[in-house]
């Protein structure tokens, strides 16, 4: 609650100078999007949330927003969906966190734990949020309070669960998408390289769960 209160108290910092205008992969169809049981299989701790965990979302709560993001960013194949959900579940600790808790980097968060500069770019890509950040060219030199306020704009569920798909499509681009569609193992390595991390054993556990959930482990 303190975090939310801080966000709302800082929103004037953001709006003061804005205007009033507010392959080989198996395909999936929009009628066969990931379901709650599949997402629980990938993120097993998402079965429930503690009342004192405001960031936390269960798989049941997350599923419609994840499905919406796949449709919005036109992610149609299971290889890419599996890689995306493996990353989301790992980074958010099974959807328990949407801002960086340790070491607590200001402005870092969403389901894929984007850094502050990407959260600003993501906010600018969303028509409802763009006017609120239109006057902010970059995160360089911004106070921690402002960085966290920008993060707060993109952490409501409808935006939080879309950030990973946005990053994959807009920041990693066609080469990584095609690599995932051709070969999940090789493509996942390319995806993690784009994110700026290694394919650790911990990340591989989530990928293997995703492969099993979507029948890609045979």
Model regions and ranges:
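Short amphipathic alpha-helical surface patches that serve as generic macromolecular interface elements
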Residues: 158-165, 185-188, 204
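Peptidoglycan-targeting cell-wall enzymes and recognition modules
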Residues: 24-65, 70, 79-173
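Fungal secretory targeting signals
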Residues: 1-24, 217-218
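Acidic helix/loop microenvironments that form the catalytic cleft of cell-wall polysaccharide enzymes
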Residues: 88-92, 176-200
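C-terminal helix/juxtamembrane-tail motif
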Residues: 202-218
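Generic alpha-helical secondary structure signal
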Residues: 57-60, 64, 186-189, 201-205
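Surface-exposed acidic, glycine-flexible loop patches that form ligand/cofactor-binding
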Residues: 72-78, 175-180
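Hydrophobic alpha-helical segments
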Residues: 167-174, 194, 198, 213
């Amino acid at each position: 609650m303190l975090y939310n209160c801080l966000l709302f108290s800082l929103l004037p910092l953001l709006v003061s100078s804005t205007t009033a205008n507010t392959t080989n992969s198996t395909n999936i169809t929009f009628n066969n999007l990931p379901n709650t049981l599949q997402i629980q299989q990938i993120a097993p701790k998402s079965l429930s949330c503690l009342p004192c965990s405001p960031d936390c979302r269960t798989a049941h709560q997350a599923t419609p927003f994840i499905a919406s993001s796949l449709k919005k960013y036109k992610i149609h194949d299971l290889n890419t969906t599996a890689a995306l959900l493996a990353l989301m579940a790992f980074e958010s600790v099974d959807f328990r966190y949407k801002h960086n808790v340790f070491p607590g980097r200001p402005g870092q968060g969403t389901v894929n734990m984007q850094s502050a500069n990407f959260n600003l770019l993501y906010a600018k890509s969303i028509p409802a949020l763009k006017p609120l950040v239109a006057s902010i060219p970059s995160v360089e030199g911004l106070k921690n309070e402002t960085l966290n306020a920008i993060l707060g704009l993109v952490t409501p569920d409808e935006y939080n669960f879309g950030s990973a798909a946005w990053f994959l499509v807009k920041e990693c681009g066609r080469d990584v998408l095609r690599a995932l569609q051709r070969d999940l193992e090789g493509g996942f390595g390319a995806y993690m390289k784009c994110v700026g991390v290694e394919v650790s054993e911990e990340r591989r556990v989530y990928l293997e769960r995703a492969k099993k959930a979507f029948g890609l482990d045979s």
